[in-house]
Amino acid sequence: MRTITLGSSSLEVPAVAVGCMRINSLDKTEAERFVRTAMEEGANFFDHADIYGGGACEEIFADAVQMNPTVREQMILQSKCGIRQGMFDFSKEHILASVDGILSRLKTDYLDVLLLHRPDALVEPEEVAEAFDQLERSGKVRHFGVSNQNPMQIQLLQKSVKQPIVANQLQLSITNATMISSGINVNMENASAVNRDGSVLDFCRLHDITIQPWSPFQYGFFEGVFLGSDKFPELNQKIDELAEKYSVTNTTIAIAWLLRHPANMQPIIGTMNTERLKDCIKATHITLTRQEWYEVYRAAGNILP
């Protein structure tokens, strides 16, 4: 498995991460087999959130690996907090309580990475800074990041937060590539030129923040998977051509497209199918040519000026 450095930290992580949002769909034996396979393949970075399965996903994961200090040393654990029923909450009290709950469910005494899940309109950076400082001093969290945040929101946090923001988890796929399209279509009068995220892609590259694409196979907001969809015939034809050329599956090509971008992204793979996970891992050893990358981009309906 190819590795990358997470943001500006010294943490070396796999080029793809395992998303655990759906691990509660597996029984204990299936969960054990899935996590064991991931570890054997070098995919030892696991992404969680306190809301996944109402907390059950973290508990199921810990039981599946029979969490103990030896097992814990072999993996990198990331979780997220800040989403509550009907609201978002970045208060110091909620962040600290959330981390304690996460650690209890995961049966560990520290997280490698904590992300703030979705922007809180009522965020007070000073409060977040106090929470981060306390978590760092106590050893409960080693690195910090965000999810679904634009450059100004990150800079607002950094006004008070002294720890580096090492990751930003963002929705990104071949068919959900507005952050790429707006950069390509600068100074053009078309829908693709509309900048909806404050140039977050370039911002993250400038500030050594690793982008973690979530839902890398989805189109729209959980409308469906583009692979094999009759809504994207040209895209699937092109992906299938490349899959045949590289002797891999279409799943591998979809992830290879993200990894070809020089931003050094770390896609979050949400599948609970071990074979599909292996296909995603194979993408770390494939480098699409520049021409192939653009062919896939255009086949998805994205335009060039």
Task: Name each region found by the language model.
Residues L103-E124:
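Active-site groove signature of glycoside hydrolases
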Residues M1-M75, R137, Q218-G220:
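N-terminal binding-site loop/beta-alpha segment at the start of enzyme catalytic domains
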Residues V18, H48, S79, V113-L116, ...:
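Conserved beta-strand positions
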Residues A43, T108-L111, V141, I165:
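A structural motif
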Residues P125-P305:
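Beta/alpha (TIM)-barrel catalytic core signal, keyed to glycine-rich beta->alpha loops juxtaposed to Asp/Glu
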Residues V71-E93, H117-R118:
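Structural motif corresponding to the early beta-alpha repeats
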Residues L26-A38, F90-L106, M152-Q155:
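Short, acidic/polar
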Residues I23-T29, A49-E59, R84-D89, D120-E124, ...:
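Acidic-and-aromatic substrate-binding clefts and catalytic sites of carbohydrate-active enzymes
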